[in-house]
Amino acid sequence: REGAVRTEKRSHIPITELRVAGGGSQSPGAMQITADVFGLPVSKPHVYEASGLGAAIDVAVGLKLHPDFSTAVEEMTHLGETFEPDQKRHALYNDIFERVYKRMYKKLKPLYTEIREIID
């Protein structure tokens, strides 16, 4: 969530929805938690293998089946299930984020740096 907050600040563009693909998108529980944590609707694509769909879109544009990527994406992708945030749970997660996570991350940052040094 912290990354999303930073992205919004830097871009000055609010994030209004999330799209999730891959393994986590197959878990209704994980999708609902994501919606609740971010306080945003979270949708998954109509296909499981989003990378395969991306490759198919590339091929479709390359073969001139669609005139451009925007058209190909619009015609070849569809939303699957959407999970709406539960505002009561979002308020709880937000409280944890503001009161605990932000402080915890600052205190752990030196340890993350040390791990990076060990790995490098």
Residue map of PLM features:
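Glycine/Thr-rich phosphate-binding loops that ligate phosphate moieties of nucleotide
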Residues: 1-120
